[in-house]
């Protein structure tokens, strides 16, 4: 994997320094009863104190070492302090065993210079053992438009992929197309009826057909192509199905691209059902054959531990209980047909065979019961491949009723017939909010929390709308920097100024607070990636905007260009750094635009 520019993670930097101090103190016999092998096993913890009086960073690790060392935490902290090698960083022992760190100005200047030098690459970090990860998300049926829930998985999945990439992993994004089974036959039947209706026939849609008016649009396109001589009118259900499938998949791809969500692979479920020309077996049959050879399948009239029901027939069961599932699962019915699980097993076997270290699936809350069986599938084929299943809650849309003035849930769409589509959320004249607002609000909560999407707030052009507030902050940086260059003829530089006393020439607390916030980007990305929590970057962007606007309001620049050039330059660089970090967060991580003027 190609190397990428590396930013300094301040938390990793301090963690390594404390770990080294523990090793040195242990070798010197100064940590009481702590054995050398115990010393190397300690993983120091670095935190950001809620009160800046306690330093920029703090380490509570001595408190946890007290029992192992049989020493007072404060004594351990004092010992570690003596072995710390941190020039330009002030260290204090406080709180009965905390190590508090305050970053010195020369150290901060180096980090700011690194930020300005790396530019669009600032925030990217490396890890000793990067993983090759397959991230599967959205994976909708190609039988209708994508709904708002799919939009949430698209926003979360694409942002998580960015986070994993920026923190050093090799990530591939995959969409599993559910294009097999009875649903595809129903899609073809529904299109055929719509075509016949447009031709003047009085024919009704079957009750279980797809009733959305989007199929009328597809039927019109089909008849238009027939009239233009591009294709003949379909004569079989298979031909109707294939046309509808192609149209729906193209629409879904277009919608996802509009939401700035790209995929590296589109995996068709049909592949799993197609016989291999060499073996004559489908991927499903090959997967079950391998499970049989590994001793994970058996025939029975009921799963192990349960009594058969009257009249039950013999089916093939997968021993999912051996991998933590609550009961064994049927993979082949008595009539010889395969269950949905059989296809899922074959699909995950295919993933395992492609050589990934880790598989991540993002699923809706209605798939919670799939966790055990999918982990069993991966575990049966390879104990070394890690599978993570992230379960997300759904989205409800709310808008003010113009008649009552109360917030009401928006449930229906004229276009789809029974739900609000992702297209509606983006571009509908009545409820559409645009791509940036859609992504922002779909990313704004942790995955395990449902989202109550306020459509009114999302289109507000005031600072109540967090998208507008963050966009405005970036645009404000750009506008000020343009003015400085074009009107004041200021030449921007990456060289950070220090006074003769090797101090940053800052005068106000807002300056240092903003700088610390900006330098935290690598650690914010690492934490969000490790916790699979893209919403944390939303909170981080809001915090940057708040800190920057406090700085902007309290720290003048233009009057200082002649009065105090050194301070003016230092403040200009904070504006440069803010613009860069917001740009990286908005475009590189969250998939939003970064307007240069508003």
Curated annotation (Swiss-Prot):
Subcellular localization is given as: Cytoplasm
> Is the keyword Hydrolase in the record?
no
Output the superkingdom of the source species.
Bacteria
What positions does the record give for the motif labelled 'HIGH' region? 140-150
The record ties this protein, via PROSITE patterns, to: AA_TRNA_LIGASE_I
Q: Pfam families, alphabetically? A: Arg_tRNA_synt_N, DALR_1, tRNA-synt_1d
**Which reactions fall under this protein's catalytic activity?**
tRNA(Arg) + L-arginine + ATP = L-arginyl-tRNA(Arg) + AMP + diphosphate
Would you kindly state one Gene Ontology biological process term found in this protein's UniProt entry?
arginyl-tRNA aminoacylation
Q: Where primarily located? A: cytoplasm
Question: In the record, what terms sit under GO molecular function?
Answer: arginine-tRNA ligase activity; ATP binding
Enzyme nomenclature, EC number = 6.1.1.19
Alphabetically ordered keywords of this record: Aminoacyl-tRNA synthetase, ATP-binding, Cytoplasm, Ligase, Nucleotide-binding, Protein biosynthesis
Q: How does it assemble?
A: Monomer.
User: Family per UniProt?
Assistant: Belongs to the class-I aminoacyl-tRNA synthetase family.
- The molecule here is called Arginine--tRNA ligase
Supply the source organism for this entry. Answer: Synechococcus sp. (strain JA-2-3B'a(2-13))
Q: What is the lineage of its organism?
A: Bacteria, Bacillati, Cyanobacteriota, Cyanophyceae, Synechococcales
């Amino acid at each position: 994997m190609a190397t990428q520019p590396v930013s300094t993670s301040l938390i990793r930097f301090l963690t390594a320094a404390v770990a080294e101090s523990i090793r040195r103190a242990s070798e010197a016999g100064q940590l009481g009863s702590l054995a050398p092998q115990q010393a190397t096993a300690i993983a120091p913890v670095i935190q950001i104190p809620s009160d800046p009086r306690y330093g920029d960073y703090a380490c509570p690790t001595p408190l946890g070492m007290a029992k192992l060392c049989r020493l007072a935490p404060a004594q351990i902290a004092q010992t570690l302090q003596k072995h710390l090698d941190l020039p330009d960083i002030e260290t204090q022992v406080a709180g009965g065993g905390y190590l508090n760190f305050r970053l010195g100005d020369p150290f901060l200047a180096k980090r700011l210079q690194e930020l300005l030098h790396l530019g669009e690459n600032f925030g990217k970090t490396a890890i000793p053992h990067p993983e090759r990860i397959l991230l599967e998300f959205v994976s909708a049926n190609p039988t209708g438009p994508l709904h708002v829930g799919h939009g949430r998985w698209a926003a979360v999945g694409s942002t998580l992929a960015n986070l994993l990439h920026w923190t050093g992993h090799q990530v591939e994004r995959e969409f599993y197309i559910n294009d097999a089974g009875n649903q595809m036959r129903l899609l073809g039947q529904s299109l055929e009826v719509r075509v016949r209706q447009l031709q003047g026939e009085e024919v009704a849609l079957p009750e279980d057909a797809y009733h959305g008016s989007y199929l009328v649009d597809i039927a019109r396109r089909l008849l238009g192509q027939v009239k233009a001589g591009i294709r003949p009118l379909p004569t079989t259900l298979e031909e109707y199905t294939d046309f509808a499938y192609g149209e729906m998949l193209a629409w879904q791809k277009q919608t996802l691209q509009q939401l700035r969500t790209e995929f590296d692979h589109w995996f068709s479920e049909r592949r799993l059902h197609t016989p291999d020309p060499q073996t004559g077996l489908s991927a499903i049959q090959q997967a079950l054959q391998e499970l049989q050879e590994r001793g994970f399948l058996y025939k029975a009239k009921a799963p192990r531990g349960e009594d058969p029901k009257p009249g039950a027939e013999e089916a093939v069961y997968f021993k999912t209980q051996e991998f933590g599932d609550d009961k064994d699962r049927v993979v082949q019915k008595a009539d010889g047909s395969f269950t949905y699980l059989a296809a899922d097993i074959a699909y995950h076997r295919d993933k395992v065979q492609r050589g990934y270290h880790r598989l991540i699936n993002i699923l809706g809350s209605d798939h919670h019961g799939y966790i055990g069986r999918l982990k069993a599938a991966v575990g049966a084929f390879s104990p070394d491949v890690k599978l993570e299943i992230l379960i997300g809650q759904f989205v409800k849309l709310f808008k003010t009723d113009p008649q009552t003035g109360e917030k009401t849930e928006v449930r229906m769409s004229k276009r789809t017939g029974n739900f609000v589509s992702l297209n509606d959320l983006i571009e509908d004249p009545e409820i559409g909010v645009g791509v940036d607002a859609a992504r922002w609000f779909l990313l704004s909560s942790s995955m395990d929390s449902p989202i109550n999407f306020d459509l009114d707030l999302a289109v507000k052009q005031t600072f109540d709308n967090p998208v507008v507030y963050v966009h405005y902050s970036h645009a404000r940086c750009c506008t000020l920097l343009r003015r400085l260059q074009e009107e004041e003829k200021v030449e921007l530089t990456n060289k950070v100024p220090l006074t003769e006393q090797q101090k940053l020439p800052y005068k106000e607390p807002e300056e240092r607070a903003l700088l610390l916030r900006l330098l935290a980007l690598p650690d914010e990305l690492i934490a969000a990636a490790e916790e699979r929590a893209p919403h944390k970057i939303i909170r981080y962007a809001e915090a940057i905007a708040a800190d920057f606007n406090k700085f902007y309001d309290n720290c003048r620049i233009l009057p200082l260009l002649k009065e105090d050039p050194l301070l003016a330059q230092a403040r200009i660089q904070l504006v440069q750094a803010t613009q860069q970090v917001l740009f990286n967060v908005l475009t590189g991580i969250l998939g939003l635009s970064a307007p240069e003027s508003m």
